[in-house]
Amino acid sequence: YSNKGNALIGANFNIKLFSNLFYGQLMLDDLNISRQKDNDENYQSGFFQNKYGFQLGFKGDLNNLSYLFEYNQVQPYTYGHRTILQNYSHMNQALAHPLGANFKEVIGVIGYKRSNWNYRLKSLVAFTGLDSLGTHYGQDIFQSDNDASTGGQYSYGNYNGQGVSTVILSLDAEVVLKLESVDVFGVISLRNKKSDLLDQTSVYYSLGVRNFPFTNFFDY
């Protein structure tokens, strides 16, 4: 299902400086400045149709140490549409980011190699605004823009993190012993999701053996 005016464009860059790579992305889902240009007497900042996101990060290595730091931000209602079938998703899954929209995210990854041992620590902190019952503050891309909680299709005054303020924390620590044809690994993961409505914490442990190249997975 398609309709005119529903487009998404993006740009990216990367700059290599010695052993470091600086990178970023900019995405525009919708940008409505005509109301301001026409001196609309009802115009205010935070118009919900100004939908965009961006990413800034750098990664590199120093001797046996590798590192990555990244910041991501997506404004409320981005990737959504007034017609739900036209949102940016596939098989009821968000294509761009698991959090949908309306979030700020900081990621840090540090790795260290010594002999046949690899160590990796990954941390993620996300600040988002979720919906309470019967509301739509722009995080859920599977709701219609016309149902925006602050004015529907004429929604002004929106800001990143509006709604039920929620902090998501994720920590992963991995140790890998590299043998001739397989890796023996152990992982411990901590997940915490906290807001005024909930406080959920989960801990996961994993031990296993994997061989390459079929199970070599990198998420960053």
Report residues per predicted region.
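Exposed, low-structure sequence patches enriched in small/polar residues
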Residues: 1-220
